[in-house]
Amino acid sequence: MKKVGSFFTLLTSKGYKKVVLIPLAFCLGFFLYSLYSNFTGGKAEKTTYDDGTTRISAQSDLGSVKLPKILDSLNIPIHNELKIRNYDVLLDKDENITSIDIYCKSNKDANEIINWYKEKLNATDDRAKGEWNGFDMDVSYSEGSKLFSISLKKQ
């Protein structure tokens, strides 16, 4: 019983507050930073498989991730209201892009965004599907997950 009382005595004394509070604040700060980095800014992961193909992916649960620089030359149209949650980029042995899957979330009306993509892709049917910089591009919306899927496959 005396040991519990001595711990509270340590907390109430002026000189020893720093001994307890500084490490406690440091641990709390590290914990909050790890939560922040895990949920908001997913880091890109690069995985190389045995056959020589490579997969680049990133995911964010709360925030938005940025597309990798390798996709800058494709100039993929991303609607202003879409927040990218995750992406997968598959590369062949020669580091050429073979397919891209981008999943986005938005608070805007799904039909409005799908119609925007239909205009961009000059789609003539009901689907937002067309050709973009040498890739077959398909944009769809899932009611269940409330996610937009933007898929590009090499022609």
What do the predicted segments below correspond to?
Residues K2-Q155:
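An acidic-aromatic pocket/loop used at catalytic or ligand-binding sites
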